[in-house]
Amino acid sequence: MAHIQSIISNALLESVSGKNTLVNDLARRRMYDTAVEEFNARDRRPKVNFSKTISEEQTLLVSNAYPEFQITFYNTQNAVHSLAGGLRALELEYLMLQVPYGSPTYDIGGNFAAHLFKGRDYVHCCMPNLDIRDIMRHEGQKDSIEMYLSRLSRSNKVIPEFQREAFNRYAEAPNEVCCSKTFQDCRIHPPENSGRRYAVALHSLYDIPVHEFGAALISKNIHVCYAASILAEALLLDQTEVTLNEIGATFKREGDDVSFFFADESTLNYSHKYKNILHYVVKSYFPASSRIVYFKEFLVTRVNTWFCKFTKVDTYILYKSVRQVGCDSDQFYEAMEDAFAYKKTLAMFNTERAIFRDTASVNFWFPKMKDMVIVPLFEGSITSKKMTRSEVIVNRDFVYTVLNHIRTYQAKALTYQNVLSFVESIRSRVIINGVTARSEWDVDKAILQPLSMTFFLQTKLAALQDDIVMGKFRCLDKTTSELIWDEVGKFFGNVFPTIKERLVSRKILDVSENALKIKIPDLYVTWKDRFVAEYTKSEELPHLDIKKDLEEAEQMYDALSELSILKGADNFDIAKFKDMCKALDVSPDVAARVIVAVAENRSGLTLTFDKPTEENVAKALKSTASEAVVCLEPTSEEVNVNKFSIAEKGRLPVCAESHGLTNANLEHQELESLNDFHKACVDSVITKQMASVVYTGSLKVQQMKNYVDSLAASLSATVSNLCKSLKDEVGYDSDSREKVGVWDVTLKKWLLKPAAKGHSWGVVLDYKGKMFTALLSYEGDRMVTESDWRRVAVSSDTMVYSDIAKLQNLRKTMRDGEPHEPTAKMVLVDGVPGCGKYKGDFERFDLDEDLILVPGKQAAAMIRRRANSSGLIRATMDNVRTVDSLLMHPKPRSHKRLFIDEGLMLHTGCVNFLVLISGCDIAYIYGDTQQIPFINRVQNFPYPKHFEKLQVDEVEMRRTTLRCPGDVNFFLQSKYEGAVTTTSTVQRSVSSEMIGGKGVLNSVSKPLKGKIVTFTQADKFELEEKGYKNVNTVHEIQGETFEDVSLVRLTATPLTLISKSSPHVLVALTRHTKSFKYYTVVLDPLVQIISDLSSLSSFLLEMYMVEAGSRXQLQMDAVFKGHNLFVATPKSGDFPDLQFYYDVCLPGNSTILNKYDAVTMRLRDNSLNVKDCVLDFSKSIPMPKEVKPCLEPVLRTAAEPPRAAGLLENLVAMIKRNFNAPDLTGTIDIESTASVVVDKFFDSYFIKKEKYTKNIAGVMTKDSMMRWLENRKEVLLDDLANYNFTDLPAIDQYKHMIKAQPKQKLDLSIQNEYPALQTIVYHSKQINGILAGFSELTRLLLEAFDSKKFLFFTRKTPEQIQEFFSDLDSHVPMDVLELDISKYDKSQNEFHCAVEYEIWKRLGLNEFLAEVWKQGHRKTTLKDYIAGIKTCLWYQRKSGDVTTFIGNTVIIAACLGSMLPMEKVIKGAFCGDDSVLYFPKGLDFPDIQSCANLMWNFEAKLYRKRYGYFCGRYIIHHDKGAIVYYDPLKLISKLGAKHIKDYDHLEELRVSLCDVACSLGNWCLGFPQLNAAIKEVHKTAIDGSFAFNCVNKFLCDKFLFRTLFLNGC
């Protein structure tokens, strides 16, 4: 396997280094995916906090030793033996990691506080007080619990849920948590049925006598015991002192006593028995009974700590008991000959231990003893004339090197001095060619002399042995032993008698006549032996009392459980509730019961208030006869209008202009017929339902009223927009906007060409300037007009009379404006797609008595076709109808049963009307709660939340689909609760295809199979123009079934309705029975869904899975007004620190090689989806220019090199920017809605309305313009003076160019995307000079806003931003909201222009100048002279316009003001498209995404965050104020810029960065909150304090900053 993995890695590296770009990209992607998987796996490791202060080397040591944990080193606590103390927590977690979670566990000598903090309620700690140190340690554990509880109390918190059981157990039965008995004497036993039992021993094993260990384990029925002990292998080899350098500890042995202590520390020593330690090391079997033994197995060695486990073994399974284990007889008798009891015991152990019979195991567990030998040393005493012997451990190669060398000496040269000289020479360092080379063997110099004597004696004896063997052997008259002694005497000379005694005594030479007799008398005793500490009384260690804290926590939990039944309990302020209970000294449980009783009206106290929603206001108002008449009343700006005054007066305020309407009040004058609608004044249609009305009656009646009003509002919006199209006399062109058409009666041509023809009605403008509605008729294809008609406006909403006819018929069913509530029984059939509505119910409907209603004509035709397939005509136009058909042409007939298909797509009031009109006894409403619901497309009309739920009597669930194939059915499992089954025999049906653009599709060259479906109406019209027939949108075919479906997406703009959770995607995927193919121009979530479904294995297609994600509420730290202290940031680190931090936050970006991307794009074939434009291909090849080399950055970031402008580069930028604008807007009455939005804008952001109404006249005047001109530069005035003003300037013509430097994104998109350049669309200098004064004056006017609550970031310094956010109250919990809008400038359309135009008008802008500005932002022409491109754009914000910045700021403020309750905002800041808002926590916000899509055409996402992010800066709060940090990651990205021309340019960059990032030089907070804020945005971010220090270091030093860039590239 290792060989295969090596081959794969080598092949992958070869692929990366190859020349094939595609293979390189795939290989890099594979390496990236592998790295991501590895990092994700690391993040899943258990997390451990290491608070002790240790060195960097020790940090690396700990990290490498414990790879199972994700360790965070805080270095915040100085302590004695910091490394060993911190390792103790890691060692405990490692031991507990081996134990199955929840299994009963004994911790021998353990830390019960550590287990309480981890919530382990299954651990019992045996904590005997064997010495004073144990008592001290146990008191410290109780102190840690006290500190923890006091910290919770100080912060008004309770014990967390995961710790409650453990703390309850300690409070109720402390002896079950810990006892003062030894493990052998412990009497605590878990329940018998609690499963296997375990034990852990952390540095406590040596305190248990070895002969008691097995019996103690079996008495607790321990299955496995895991132990960790500190051990030095040299201690087993008669060493009297051994140092453990890694943890700074020392073992010291004196006889059988072993002391353990830490160097240079005054802490008490640990004492153990040497024999006990030795037994635990050398024994493998620990007998527990005649049958059971515990077998020891070493696990791992980490930082001087040995881990092992003792496993319970039943020896009867091996057919032998422990007593039958025999001993090695040779070792046994050899041991008996030795008089030392210690050696005899050791020999007995050698017969049992299995580990030392395996050389590999010995080398593994004793790595330092590998290739080491024990050599005796001889030392003589001058005074006593005696010689002593000791032993030393040296390297085996060293010994044989010395012996082999000196064995070559001649007899005369073999002296002690020569041997010592050679040993010293090979031990010393050697200098070779001026370089010092260290000796291979590290032998202590102190033992070289006695060691040389040993080598000398061994060589002498070996030489003597050789002489005896090789010499001629003669006995003569001496015995053999005498001859040998003679030879030995000749060899050693005069020292022979002493040497003889020593050799015989040490068994180097042995004779039979001398017997070994050793007697060791007790010569002395030590002072320690005389010191005896006796205890006269035994005391139990008292337990810590935590009952009070647990009682408080229990009471709070009970109180919150009681309060959870209240409506809106998720918004309950727990902190205020706790403060109230504490201030009033009342039990939380009692207070909660009182609150619930009051809320449920069980206390005798009636609440006179409720949340003023539409639902509650409707309940509070009484129904009176006067409410049937709703009138319109013009209101002045001084009158405060609210929904309560509207309901009381029965009048509606006129929000828009009256268009000449003089009556103060208009009674209900509904149009009785279509004839009344013909030539009706537009004012009578527009001024209907322009404000939110509080409805009365039952909920069904309220829904029906709302539906009628929504039809009127839709008609009003359509007529209003048509009137606006007729008033826009400038800019008509035949290249229309598709939705609206304007016919010029005089010229007999379309000024704006509509997408379709044959409109039923429209709005007419006559020569007198009056506008009225008209019913249209045709003679052939020509529209019939009258002589006084000037223009006719139509739209896609005027094709039929639907809304008009519906209003007419529904009002006829109402009596005095009150609809009748339907009395029929209503049953909701909630079924999955294809659940068999037709097969199960529709096939059994009665021809004469039942009625089936469907949304569209296609569905009605399908049902009729199926019902009549047998030849018998059962379904007709009378009993199978569309919803619109029944509402527009009701027939006076009652039905027994009513079937409404896709009823949840309809307005709830519409469903109620259908039931009422049909006169049925029971109504079955078929729908799918997961598919597309009813969408309110009239954005200026309210559709309250409580109206969305259909009121039914029964709900029937259906979870079996007869339509969907197996792969689609698998997709449905994640959408519905419960199992979704299918009866389809088709397993695989979905596929996708990428197309190069809409130009690829043609009905002849590329026919599409089956039903053709699109997501948007724009794509539908595009396909119809290309010749495709029978095309519908997804919304239109909901509820229908087809064998084959072709789904087409031609819009490259991101669509919010295409997502994994979108109901549109669900509907699109569930319309087919056989095949489904998706044609798309971009990769989107639906492509990913299809890819995932295609890769499923066959057996998975029959499985189901339902998962629900958890929601978390983000909270933000509170602050209060104050000031920031200044503490200089340390200047440390180097550029590798910056590179490391950048790679961690944005992994893979630094590996992108983008130097030749622009060249590659020019050389390769490109498929571009281009809108209408004119291209000059003569400029496709740019002129070669000499480019001066730029400075090369040392840091590798995603920064792109500068690009040269050209046809291709500019065209790509224009396609991705200007041609990629979203089209999401629904039906809007533009002028009326803009007026309402601007009203909210001024009401929300300005202190008083009078402030900007009274000062307008004195601002936009000639004098004010002259004052502005006095402050302008002479160059601008000269340009204006020389300009020819005989005619209006070309206000609608703009120039186009691109920025040479692409904008860096702080994401990973650079790895798979060619970033488009930013476009600049700008006016001429003369036009900018004219409009510059207007922009400046409007900026001054906007200073009238409420500066305490809102900040418009115009000419503000970072210090002013910081000051603005410094007064937030730290005691008020807040939600930080950030609206992220993509393509902000390009999304702005006619509605945005109307809003901005209305704001400028109210600020006093001259009418003529305002009209000039408006025409300059409507239909505009763009010319790019460098690239040779010309195109036309409708609206869109121009990036080079003088009003761009102030206009964008105003639009984002108006947008948020129209969607969010700005009266409740705490703080808000706006700058261009950036915004950040602070609201009180717990507010209910509307559907921001839907409103932003349908009203503002914004692809927006609303984020709730903990920290604010505004204009590239993090807003960090603390208890003394706020600090605004420039985004460090953005700053580091700029340090990798590749467009720096020279060092002067580089210095300008440094000064600029110093100005914006000055706050990084203040270290008063130490950057922890900044790290948390960055982590909130970049999930892979780590603690970046080291990088921030490094940034500050480089920015503060001009010359050091230069080292980040190299001269030349």
From Swiss-Prot:
Keyword Methyltransferase: no
Annotated Alphavirus-like MT domain residues: 72-281
Activity regulation annotation text: In resistant plants, is bound by host protein Tm-1 (e.g tomato Tm-1 AC A7M6E7), thereby inhibiting replication complex activity.
Boundaries of every (+)RNA virus helicase C-terminal domain copy: 959-1111
Leader peptide range in chain numbering: none
UniProt-listed Enzyme Commission number(s): 2.1.1.-, 2.7.7.-, 2.7.7.48, 3.6.4.13
Catalytic activity as recorded in UniProt: RNA(n) + a ribonucleoside 5'-triphosphate = RNA(n+1) + diphosphate; ATP + H2O = ADP + phosphate + H(+)
Gene Ontology biological-process entries: DNA-templated transcription; mRNA modification; RNA processing; symbiont-mediated suppression of host innate immune response; viral RNA genome replication
Region (Methyltransferase): 50-453
Other known facts: This protein is translated as a fusion protein by episodic readthrough of a termination codon. When readthrough of the terminator codon TGA occurs between the codons for Arg-1111 and Gln-1113, this results in the addition of the RdRp region to the replicase.
Assembly and oligomerization: Heterodimer of a large and a small subunit. Both large and small subunits interact, via an ATP bridge, with host protein Tm-1 (e.g. tomato Tm-1 AC A7M6E7 and AC A7M6E8).
Full protein name: Replicase large subunit
